[in-house]
């Protein structure tokens, strides 16, 4: 993600593709999409809050859904291989 995109609060994705294999980025996208957000950028635009992350892995620890309930995630991988192809990767 480019720095200019992070500064633009109204950035819209230009394209979307599906993840082919698991990575740390795919893991975090999976967590955001489970909570009802496109990605970290959309979460920051809507909630305007810091994202809690696990210090050792860097994975998302806690997200607030749009209905104000919370999702708590484990320190370890949660996106199983059979779920990887469902994760959407957006390009800006």
Swiss-Prot record:
Keywords assigned by UniProt, alphabetized: Differentiation, Spermatogenesis
InterPro entries: Meiosis-expressed_gene_1 (IPR020186)
One Pfam short name: Meiosis_expr
Single biological process term from Gene Ontology: spermatogenesis
Keyword Ribonucleoprotein: no
Ribonucleoprotein listed as a keyword: no
A cellular component annotation (GO) from this entry: nucleus
Domain of life: Eukaryota
Known function: Essential for spermiogenesis.
Similarity comment: family membership: Belongs to the MEIG1 family.
Protein name, entry field: Meiosis expressed gene 1 protein homolog
Source organism: Danio rerio
Upper lineage: Eukaryota, Metazoa, Chordata, Craniata, Vertebrata
Chain's gene name: meig1
């Amino acid at each position: 993600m480019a720095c200019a995109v992070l500064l633009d609060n109204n950035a819209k994705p230009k394209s979307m593709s599906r993840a082919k294999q698991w990575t740390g980025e795919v893991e975090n996208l999976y967590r955001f999409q489970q909570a009802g957000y496109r990605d970290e950028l959309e979460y920051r635009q809507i909630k305007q809050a810091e994202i809690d992350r696990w210090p050792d892995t860097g994975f998302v620890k806690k997200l607030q859904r749009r209905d104000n309930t919370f999702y708590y995630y484990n320190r370890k991988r949660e996106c199983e291989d059979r779920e990887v192809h469902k994760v959407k990767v957006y390009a800006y």
